[in-house]
Amino acid sequence: MNNSIITDDEVREFYLNCSSQTIIESLLSLHESLRLYSQNHEILLNRMFKKLDETNADSNISHIFMPVVSKDFSGIKILVNNNNKNFQGVINVIEPETGKLIGCFEAKQITAIRTALASCIGLYKQLSCSHDKLFRFENGTCYLTCFGTGLQAFWHIYIAIKLIMSGIVGESLKLVEINILYHNNMMSLDRLKSLKNLFGSNIKIELNQYQINDISSEGNGAVSNSDIIFGCLPTLEPNLFLRQLLNSKASVEQKHTYISLIGSYKPVMHECDKELIDKFKSDNESACILVDSREHTLLESGELIDSNIAPHNLIEIGELDTLKNTVLNLNEKGCKRTITLCKIVGLAVMDVALAKEFLSLRTKNTENKE
């Protein structure tokens, strides 16, 4: 390694200009790291918190250290929490046996991209499954709804589009309608619009933005029609409601919706209502909520805590081999819908693993150009 830091700009530009196959390679590599975590939770050590100035009761600055130790990848993520400037930090990757530093990254882009990739692992598995076609895409249209307009929201939409572009969906898909729901600030769509040209004439992309006002807003219809829903808003009150998914007008045929929620990360936060979570407790077929970590989601996710979700109601992404335990049937009141619900709170394992994968992909990309 040279004496440089891999910047957020470098990471962003690499993934904005990579192929769909590179996205899939990164996703599968991240899935493997979560398998290692599920097999041995001890590779993720306890977080360490330290206030910068413990003599000052008014000081809001604290440091968070998140070490990862395994034979496959080792390193540490360090964040500084300043309530006035949000989180800033770094990710250091080392060789597990020698301790040699092999990569030092600014943390913002890696964090956002690894979260979006983790969100889409289950989606990729379901889209690419040839035995059980869950997605019907009525009238040749895939409806994707995203709550939020920030960095996380952008990467969720971008990666989902790249997966669809990879060809795993089939030739029947003609249109991807993306509906972005926001509170105050709209998303800049320049980068997403540039993807339209990559689809060619076979698939079109339509981009819409709606402000979240109330349940009767125009965006509510977008939610009810959705094949894919991403929740990327840190919010105390729910934005997604079970009754939106039970809307019998949403589909005349059986419909499947993949939902991933990543915005809430504290017990007081809620992205969806209690009624939706409770469906997984009452399901006779024992469908589970897909999570990155049982332990951490049950400590940090307000939605799961309020519904008293038990560990057996959850399945870790690292345990995901078949799809049957992640599909919940909502067929009631005339609604023909199944859903998969994924909840991500984030693990340092994901940061260190993706940082290491980035180094490998960048080296391979450089060699291919020579």
Swiss-Prot record:
In-chain residues carrying the UniProt-annotated modification N-acetylmethionine: M1
Key words of the record: Acetylation
GO cellular component, one term: cytoplasm
Gene3D superfamilies in the cross-refs: NAD(P)-binding Rossmann-like Domain, ornithine cyclodeaminase, domain 1
Keyword Acetylation: yes
Domain of life: Eukaryota
Matches recorded under InterPro entries: NAD(P)-bd_dom_sf (IPR036291), ODC_Mu_crystall (IPR003462), ODC_N (IPR023401)
Note: Present with 172 molecules/cell in log phase SD medium.
Family, per entry: Belongs to the ornithine cyclodeaminase/mu-crystallin family.
The name this protein goes by in its record: Uncharacterized protein YGL159W
Source organism of the structure: Saccharomyces cerevisiae (strain ATCC 204508 / S288c)
Taxonomic lineage: Eukaryota, Fungi, Dikarya, Ascomycota, Saccharomycotina
